[in-house]
Design a protein with these regions (language model features):
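Short, glycine/acidic-enriched capping/hinge loops at junctions between secondary-structure elements
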Residues: 31-33, 45-48
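The AdoMet/dcAdoMet-binding core of the Class I SAM-like
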Residues: 47-133
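N-terminal auxiliary segments of SAM/dcSAM-dependent transferases
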Residues: 1-33
Length: 133
């Protein structure tokens, strides 16, 4: 069993205070990893079906044989991981505004570990998606 609550990382960012934490939900007997921005819940790994669907639905409609995919926003990485689950993807570039989020993936402190960082098809870029896309 884990600690009931653990702050994994704290960073000041251009958007405010960013916290990565893990807490135990006793009723479900599981840990949940959460991202908090300025004391507001941003995301968690409690329910990731929508993040996975965000990748799988368009990938199912894509006719390209070896597509190069661009994703705006990395978060906990479930959308990117779902894209890479399609073996025909040639490359995936993920643009993330907050440097600590990219660092978490490189350090392997998230539930996916270093899965994205270790995949040679995946490039994580710090920047403003709308300015770079």
């Amino acid at each position: 069993m884990s600690h009931f609550f653990e702050e994994l990382d704290y960073s000041k960012t251009p958007l405010g205070e960013l916290v990565l934490r893990r807490r135990r939900i006793l009723k479900l007997d599981r840990d949940v990893v959460e991202v908090i921005l300025n004391d507001e819940h941003l995301m968690s790994d409690y329910f990731t079906v929508s993040e996975v669907a965000l990748a799988n639905i368009p990938m199912a409609l894509l006719a390209a044989d070896a597509p190069d995919i661009l994703v705006g926003g990395l978060g906990l990485g479930y959308t990117a991981d779902a894209v890479l689950g399609h073996d025909h993807v040639r490359s995936l570039t993920v643009i993330e505004y907050l440097a600590p989020v990219i660092r978490w993936h490189h350090q392997g402190v998230l539930p996916l570990g270093t899965t994205l960082s270790d995949d040679p098809r995946c490039t994580l870029v710090e920047g403003d998606f709308f300015a770079l896309a």
